[in-house]
Design a protein with these regions (language model features):
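Serine-hydrolase catalytic-loop signature spanning alpha/beta hydrolases and amidase-signature enzymes
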Residues: 57-60, 82, 127
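Short amphipathic alpha-helix adjacent to the substrate-entry channel of hydrolases
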Residues: 63-85, 92-94
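Alpha/beta-hydrolase active-site loop
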Residues: 100-134
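C-terminal catalytic histidine-bearing segment of alpha/beta-hydrolase fold enzymes
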Residues: 38, 236-311
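N-terminal cap/lid segment of alpha/beta-hydrolase-fold proteins
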Residues: 19-45
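Primarily recognizes the serine-hydrolase "nucleophile elbow" in alpha/beta-hydrolase
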Residues: 124-198
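The feature captures the conserved acid-bearing segment of alpha/beta-hydrolase catalytic domains
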Residues: 167-239
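Short beta-strand element of the alpha/beta-hydrolase
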Residues: 46-57
Length: 311
């Protein structure tokens, strides 16, 4: 009996290791940038797939970071393939500057960075649609998920579909089956998304003391970031489905930690919102009583210091 159990244990370990081994492929070439993706497939003829975008402030990060691989395995176990992608990091242009850029120049760089990341998201999605049969992907069930800068990209990307931002890349009428954002926000230079009514369910995780990505909003004229507190208020008015995990007094660690500690909520979202089409609005307030309460308002300079250091 012990020998039989030992054999099963070895097979289980081998199975887990095999499931975690992705297939790497090129999904797009943009100028001198060759963009690759790691595809973590599941054993199914036509499975839903999550396009994942890593975090790193549009400056750094990796599609293959060990911070995410356990989460990818969890998604595989739930029957979802994962397409973890490279995307162009526009703020790496800061490396070549001898002087600190002006505010106007910084806004231009940030806008260009988000635009490039969103375009790369659309390109990755188009690749999946084109190769859906050979990759075993259900083209009607492609979701997007991101951490921090990646979360900004997926929220902004899905919002941009209704604004014809993907024209010429994705088929007319295409939409994602769902969005999962770990510490993200919509970034726009066209004014606030006052009538925010995403046509697919959205799940958001965010900490109220996050000084990297706005929990509420951070706007200067028509330029701004709009976080989940702002977005869910609009979604209440437009009756759009969402699941928001609101971490009181938590900082930017929410860009990663829920991938491990809040899988029950993610599984609920996938099963009920994505698979069953439930039209629910859930806000889950989470407070760690061992964590000091955050006092004071987070201002624009707090975001500047958190993302770019002392200016």
């Amino acid at each position: 009996m012990k020998r039989i159990l030992a054999v099963f244990a070895v097979l289980a370990v081998m199975s887990g290791a095999f499931a975690a081994q992705p297939k790497t492929m090129v999904y797009s070439v943009r100028g001198t940038d060759t963009l690759r993706a790691d595809y973590y497939s599941v054993q199914a003829p036509s499975a839903p797939c999550v396009v994942f975008m890593f975090g790193g402030g549009f400056y750094s990060g990796s599609r293959a970071s060990s911070s995410y691989t356990d989460y990818f395995e969890f998604l595989n176990e739930k029957g979802y393939g994962v397409f973890s992608i490279d995307y162009r990091l526009g703020l790496k242009a800061l490396d070549g500057m001898s002087e600190k850029p002006s505010l106007g120049r910084m806004v231009g760089l940030l806008t260009g960075s988000v635009d490039m990341a969103v375009t790369d998201l659309y390109e990755a999605t188009a690749f999946l649609l084109k190769h859906a049969d050979e990759l075993g992907v259900d083209a009607d069930r492609i979701l997007v998920c991101g951490s921090s800068a990646g979360a900004i990209s997926v929220l902004t990307g899905q919002w941009g579909l209704a604004r014809r931002r993907a024209e010429g890349i994705l088929p007319t009428g295409f939409d994602y089956a769902g969005v999962i954002s770990f510490a993200g926000a919509i970034y726009t230079v066209q004014g606030a998304p006052r009538h925010y009514a995403p046509s697919c369910p959205v799940m958001m995780f965010h900490g109220s003391a996050d000084s990297n990505v706005p929990y509420r909003k951070l706007a200067l004229g028509k330029i701004g970031f709009y976080g989940p507190q702002y977005l869910t208020k609009r979604m209440n008015r437009t009756e759009a489905p969402y699941y928001w995990c609101d971490f009181q007094d938590a900082d930017h660690k929410i860009a990663v930690s829920p991938m491990n500690s809040n899988r029950e909520q993610i599984a609920y979202f996938l099963e009920n919102y994505v698979e069953k089409g439930a039209r629910l609005q859930i806000t889950e307030n989470i407070r760690n009583l061992d964590q000091p309460a955050h006092k004071g308002k987070i201002g624009i300079m707090d975001y500047v210091r958190s993302n770019f250091g002392e200016q």
